[in-house]
């Protein structure tokens, strides 16, 4: 029994359908998706104003984030390990700073008590 002939018509239909899905789908999404400018123009004026005010701050935050990622990537260790270590150092630094502030407040209170001045209820110390 001779081998079956190749069904070129079926394979060509499948190739056309595959190319249509692989190329046409992303092209359709690209065509339909609005640009940032179009979205911005659809905002109400209050949101546009707020967005313009916050734009510089968000850009600075993003630049700082990218700079930290570049710094983390210089190490041989994974980025998430470096980021976790930096966050831990940041937290411990804040805790130490809060402890120093509390100690200074206690010292001020003691100085006031020693000087004989009465603390007023609702006062700042």
UniProtKB/Swiss-Prot annotation:
Region (Disordered): 103-125
Keywords: Chaperone, Coiled coil, Membrane, Mitochondrion, Mitochondrion inner membrane, Transmembrane, Transmembrane helix
Protein location: Mitochondrion inner membrane
Membrane topology: Single-pass membrane protein
CC terms in the record's Gene Ontology section: mitochondrial inner membrane; mitochondrial membrane
Matching InterPro entries: Cbp4 (IPR012420)
Any one GO BP annotation for this protein: mitochondrial respiratory chain complex III assembly
Pfam families: CBP4
Main subcellular location of this protein, as a coarse class: mitochondrion
Transmembrane segments: 15-34
UniProt feature coiled coil, ranges: 92-119
Family stated for the protein in its record: Belongs to the CBP4 family.
Protein name as annotated: Assembly factor cbp4
Organism: Sclerotinia sclerotiorum (strain ATCC 18683 / 1980 / Ss-1)
Name of the gene: cbp4
């Amino acid at each position: 029994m001779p081998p079956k002939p190749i069904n070129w018509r079926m394979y060509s239909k499948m190739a056309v359908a595959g190319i249509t899905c692989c190329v046409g789908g992303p092209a359709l999404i690209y065509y339909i998706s609005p640009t940032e400018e179009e979205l911005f123009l659809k905002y109400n004026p209050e949101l546009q104003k707020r967005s313009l005010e916050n734009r510089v701050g968000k850009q600075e935050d993003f630049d700082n984030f990218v700079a930290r990622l570049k710094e983390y990537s210089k190490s041989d260790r994974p980025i998430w390990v470096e980021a976790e270590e930096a966050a831990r150092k940041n937290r411990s630094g804040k805790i130490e700073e809060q402890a120093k502030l509390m100690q200074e407040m206690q010292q001020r209170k003691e100085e006031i008590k020693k000087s004989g001045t009465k603390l007023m209820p609702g006062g700042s110390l």
